[in-house]
Every structure is written in structure tokens, then in C-alpha cells.
Amino acid sequence: NNSRKTLITNVVRQSEHLNTILNINYSYLNVLAQELSKSQDLFSEDNVSLIQAFMHNTDLNRTAIIDPNGNALYDNEVIKNVAHRRYFKESMQSKQSLSDPLESSVDQQTRVILCVPIFRDRQVIGVVGGSYNVTKLGNMLFDDLFEGQGKSFIVDQGGNLITRNKQYEKKHKLNTVDNLFNVCNQKKIKTDFKNQKSDLVLIQTKKKESLYLAYSPLKINDWMVGYIVPVHAAQESYTFITHYETLLATFLGLIVLSLIVYLAHSSSRENKYLIHLSEIDPLTSVFNKET
């Protein structure tokens, strides 16, 4: 039905939107990488100033320049070695990379590292990366859809939650759920996740509540964007929208009809006036001649 179509359409659009946001941040990093490559010393004071300014003017939280040995110099001038990290290894192979999510023990926010290679004369001379708050990214989803009665999230191919809303989980007693497949263990969902396909399925909770689950691939790291909403909420919302659209169409129809009647009436009055003018015009001519 139409509420199902609305859900699928929205989850696909949101997936495309998030993909665009991440790609914009990759673009920022690529521009920064070009500037960093101009200095013979990757860890020069000018480059440190560059990444500090970059961090303050983008949504990336922590920025680092990484040399070929994996030594990372951060914007706060702390140095760590990340040679063992997948994102570093992939970027050293001329690839853009996105790390696995990490939850901060300080603010419980989930962050990922976006990394791009630094080129000079077509050779990779290092890596530049920045951390991005995916919890914040996830909270941007579906804020106004179905009056906030549903919940959006990002999961990996294995169903592990990447973004989560602690307040929502506490309200609905979902704080122990770490994997989507623990809630809805349908073969179709797992197959669609593996094949990176969009769809919508009906699931039943242990409390016999019917829910719609819509999902679509994010096209980065095999992640999926998901949205779950009670069936009654989706259907009620669509019924309201349909009723509203019917009222609006009726109102516009009445306006058009009134306009047609008005124009017809105006045309009739104008015709009568022209006839009246044609009757007095000869008299006027005669009157003008007599004067």
C-alpha cells in the first residue's frame, strides 16, 4: 500500500543523503591532502596550523596527519602510532577509507575515522584523517516522518548497530539490543543485507506488536540505513495525509469553479455593456453633430 511505498522511498532518500554527507567530508579531506603535500615536511608547523583550522571549520572532530610509518600527528599535537589500523593501510594503498565504529567511553557517542591518501607526484607520501560523529549523523534521519513515532539507525552487514539513541532505547527498554537480527531474525533481511538491497518487511515483536522495517544500503562499508515504525502509526499518518489531500483538492476545485462562474458573469456583464454602448453611440454622434 501507499504507506509502505512512502517508507521505502524515504529510507532510500535518506541513505543517499547520508552517503552524500560522507562524500562531502571526503572531498574536504582531499582538498586538505593537496595542501599538506606542498610542504616537504608533513609534520611542519604550517601543516599543523592547517589541520587545526580545518577541524574548526568542518564537522570532523579530530584531525591527524599520518606518515608512511603510521605515526599520526593530531591537531592537538599528540602523536600516536596507527600503523596497525585498517583505515591507515587502505589509504596507503591509494584508497579512501572508513574505519569501524568506536564508541567513546566519555560521551557514549559513536565515531568513525575518514581517511584519504596524500599524494605527491602520484605517489602516496602519507595519510590525512578525521573523526566523524555517526551518532549525530544517525539522529538526522527521519526527524519529521510519522510524527517521530519511528526510529532510524545505521547497521553493518551483520546487523550490528552502529548508531543508537540511548533515550529511545531506555523508553522502549531496548538497551540490551546490540544486533538487529536478535529482534528480527528473518532470512530475507540477512540475504538483502548481504546483497545490499532495499526493501520493507513486516515484523512482530515479542509483545505481538506489528512493525514495519525499511532498509537501504548506504554504499559505504556495506552499511545499511534502517527505519522501524509501528504499522498503525504509518497507516494513520497516511490516512491523515490522504484526507488532507482530498480536502485540499476539494477546496482548490471550489476556487476554480468560483473563478469560472465569476469570469462567465463578468463576460456577460461586459457583453451587455457593449450592446448598450452600441445603442447609444449613434445618438451620441447625432448629438455631437447638432452641437
How would you label these PLM feature ranges?
Residues 66, 70-77, 160-165, 214-215:
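Amphipathic coiled-coil signal-relay and dimerization helices
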Residues 1-42:
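Juxtamembrane extracytoplasmic/periplasmic/luminal helical "stalk" adjacent to the first N-terminal
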Residues 43-59, 90, 119, 123, ...:
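Solvent-exposed, extracytoplasmic
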Residues 178-246:
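Extracellular/periplasmic juxtamembrane segments that couple receptor/chemosensory ectodomains to their
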Residues 68-144:
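Extracytoplasmic/periplasmic ligand-binding sensor regions of membrane-associated signaling proteins
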Residues 48-50, 75-103, 168-202:
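Extracytoplasmic/periplasmic sensor domains and loops in membrane signaling proteins
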Residues 232-274:
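Cytoplasm-proximal transmembrane signaling helix
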Residues 274-291:
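Conserved nucleotide-binding and Mg2+-coordinating catalytic segments in signaling enzymes
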